[in-house]
């Protein structure tokens, strides 16, 4: 689910996007590839009943809250099974082609397959940001990035 614009839960990437490639690489059937629009209705989302939701962008926490608190989303398998995840936000978008792209894959693998992967995302972010941007980050700052928060730990919207 895209959250770069405040378009709500029904805003996603479609076939041919980098996120389709990424989630197919991680072993998923990317639902966005089967949709005819990047803004499916509530009914289309319910009919698909995804096993996992992944939310990115500055509105990710707003969308995650909607999924977890509003009908009809609260009845979806991903929500009931607590498989609603975020994509970190940093100096560049993690889910777009950037210095953070490899970390995006490691982070998502940790979240989606915790029984198999335990990558040290905090260290990866700190090392990458230092190398590419010349900036030292604290664990707290990295935590904000990993949780989709602003540099002070507050909401991005």
Annotate each language-model stretch with its function.
Residues 1-157:
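N-terminal ligand-binding lobe of clamshell/alpha-beta domains
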């Amino acid at each position: 689910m895209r959250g770069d614009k405040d378009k709500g839960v029904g805003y996603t990437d479609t076939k041919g996007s980098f996120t389709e490639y990424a989630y197919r690489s991680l072993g998923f059937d990317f639902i966005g590839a089967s949709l005819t629009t990047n803004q499916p209705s509530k009914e289309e989302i319910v009919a698909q009943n995804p096993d996992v939701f992944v939310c990115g962008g500055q509105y990710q926490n707003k969308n995650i809250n909607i999924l977890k608190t509003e009908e009809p989303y609260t009845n979806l398998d991903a929500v009931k099974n607590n498989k609603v995840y975020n994509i970190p936000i940093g100096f560049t978008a993690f889910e777009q082609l950037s210095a953070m792209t490899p970390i995006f894959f490691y982070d998502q693998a940790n979240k989606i397959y915790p029984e198999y992967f335990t990558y040290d995302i905090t260290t990866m972010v700190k090392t990458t940001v230092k190398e590419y941007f010349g900036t030292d980050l604290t664990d707290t700052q990295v935590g904000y990035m990993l949780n989709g928060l602003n540099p002070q730990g507050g909401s991005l919207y």
